[in-house]
Amino acid sequence: MQVEITGSAVDQDTIITVADLKAHLRVTHTAEDTLISALRSAAISWVEEHCNIKLGSYTARGYLPGFYNSYIPIGPVTAITEVKYQTTEDKTYANLSTLLATNWFSDEITQPARIAFRDYPQVYEYALMPVVVSFTAGHTTMPAPVLQAIRLLVAHMYENRQEEVIGTITTRLKFGLEALLNPFRIIYQP
C-alpha cells in the first residue's frame, strides 16, 4: 500500500513545545528559539520515520492495486473511514465509487492495522492503483517515552552541531533512543 498524507500539517506545539525543550536544555534566553524549533522538527521527523508512526492526528489515503487484504504501513491507525475504487479511466481520482462498509473489515487494534475485503466489484483493469482507503492515523496523546526520545535527539543535535566530535570519548545515544522507541515501532513487511 502506498500512503499519502492528505490533511494539513500538525502544529508541532501540540506534540512538544519549544519551552519544554528549552527547559530540558537549560536554555533561558530566546536567541536560539528558531534553532531549537528547527531541531524539534528534525527530531519529530526522525522519530516518525524510525517508528513508522505519526505524531499528532493526520488524515491519509492508502492506494492499493486491487481489493487485496492489506496492512496499513503507518500508524497508529485510529479509524478507517471509507474505501473507494476506480471503475473508469480517471487519473485524478475525482470520480470514484464508494465500496459499502459491509464489504470490508478493518482491524485498528493491532498495529500495523489491517483491512480485508469481501464481495467486491470489478475495478478498472488498466488502473495502477484503483482502490483508495481513507483513514486517520497518529498519536493524539504523546507517549512519555516518545517525548523523552525527542528531547534526547534535540539535546544531542543542539550540543553536537557537526557530524563528528573530535577529542571526546565515544558515547552511544542510539541505545537510549532504541530503548525508548522500540515499543512504538510498527514493523511493516509488504
Located regions from the model:
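Divalent metal-cofactor coordination and adjacent catalytic microenvironments
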Residues: 1-190
